[in-house]
Amino acid sequence: MKLNRRMFLATTTSAAVLTALAACAKNGSGSSGSTAGVPTAAPEELQDGGTLRFGIGSAPANWNAATVDGNVVDVSLVMKFVSPFVVDWAADGKATPNPDFLTKLEAAEVGGKTVVTVAVNEKATWGNGRKWDSEDIKVFFDHVKDPSYSWATVEGLDKVEKVEIVDKQTAKVTFNSVYPDWSNALAGVTPRELMADAKTFNESMAGATKFNNDYFAGPFKIKSYDESKQVITLERNDKWWGATPKLETVTLHVLDDSALGQAFANKEIDVLDYIFSADVYQQASGRDDAEVRQNTGLQWRHIMFNASSGPLADKAVRQAIVRACDREAIAASDLAVLPVDAKKTLLGNRFFLPVQEGYQDNSTSWGHDVEAAKKLLDGAGWVAGSDGVRAKDGTKLELVMTIPSNAPVATNEANLLQKQLGEVGIKLSVSTVEIDKYFPEYINKKNYALTAFTSEKTQYPLANVGQYYASTSQSNYTGLSVPEVDQHVAKIGSTPDGAERNKLANELDKILWENVFNIPIYQRMQLTAVPKTLRNFGAQGLASFRPERIGYVKS
């Protein structure tokens, strides 16, 4: 999950089905035809050349997307152009290997364990000129359990028991049990040079100017990062062995959220993904050469708690905040004027989206109820003072919500929550911090009390259930450690039956509601504005994209 899924192996783990789903596509196609969100075109219909310009929220704090600081949506976007994503996902979430990277990805159940045979394409080449080999796979997994490596999450990766070298291109990966989401653990390949030691892994690409193309292998490479203009420029990778990209360059411009809509309207950027405000939607709709494409979104908005100290360490306080929080009002305000029914976007589940098998609304006992919130606080000994603010043992119930600068959605949510919590005797102040420091200095270091941000799901609903919630995860921003949560995370990861996994996930979600790790608010529908002539890219939904296929139709 990225600070960001349909499980394609949700209902079976038979060897036959595992192998069939992972069978290599003969023609190398990972798409399933045009959708409303992604109009397609054949290569011969597209221009050779052109630039695609994105807006992003901040420059990368770390170009290694596997690290805590690099595990953000903006870095993930860059990586989709320059780094190997060896699995393609179609619009229905089904996966097939990308033959530019892999010639085999097959799984079987052997002795109660999932065993996967992986063969890399002998043409695949790292940026340093070295060919891929099976050692890259083995060395990667050799370091997964090393705590000195700053992993964002090792969930799934840590289930690999051993990696055996079959030949120069082929490795056999054995998991410690039957593992339905095995392909998620093998969806990328990392050069062994980046895994050399913890310092290299953690720090060699820490900083906006410290990218290193030696560690990448994709249709594009990073040409530059202009610090003064805050622009990342990607160019065609001269070591790329696949089809020549149709685009010549891709640029990513660091912009405040508040500036994105106008930048798109002014034709300064070409992609406006996940439009989430009325003003921005109107700006995008007004651009004469553009259109807004729509699809099921993977992003979800939530309020996060730091429960490691202070009043929020009291579960009753967290529960009272849930009951005082009017999620429907927040969603309606955030999504006003957009072509979206806010009520239908409310999310009652942390793992499944409403369109996915396994979804059930587990929030029904935690709806907006001011009187219930007051009773929780009364029962926990928080007494209202003459100023209306509650206190206990001389400590006032005062909290600070930390939000990034120039983030209108977060500002709106903070203002609404401030009023809602005030009704039950909780004083909420708002602290706005520099967006570049928001995650590395505040959230990652648990230097906050409350916050709200967007996460992005993947095609695997249950692949990283412990990322925010397991006591050992570096991305557990709450500081909470609940044994029952850890037990369910472990069970979900080792249960082969899809229906049983879904049941366990919903049990876990109910435990998370009870303990209030966070508050899911709503799912963002994917509204993406792009030029009308752009093909093979748009509102992707569950589908991945091939960077080399993106282009503009010939005039």
Residue ranges and their predicted role:
Residues T35, T528-S555:
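Long beta-strand-rich cores associated with HINT superfamily self-processing modules
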Residues R236-Q283, K427-S429, E434:
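Ligand-site clamp/hinge motif
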Residues E235, A313-K419, E507, K554:
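Append "and occasionally in soluble cytosolic enzymes with long acidic Gly/Pro-rich linkers
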Residues E227-K229, V383-K457, G498:
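Ligand/substrate-recognition segments at binding pockets and active sites
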Residues V73, K80, A90-D92, G188-P245, ...:
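Gly/Pro-rich hinge or "lid" segments in bacterial periplasmic/extracellular proteins
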Residues G55-E109, D142, Y215-F216:
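N-terminal lobe/hinge region of extracytoplasmic solute-binding protein
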Residues L9, E45, E423, K427-F439, ...:
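Extracytoplasmic/peripheral linker and loop segments enriched in polar/acidic and small residues
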Residues Q47, V154-T200:
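Surface-exposed binding/hinge segments that line
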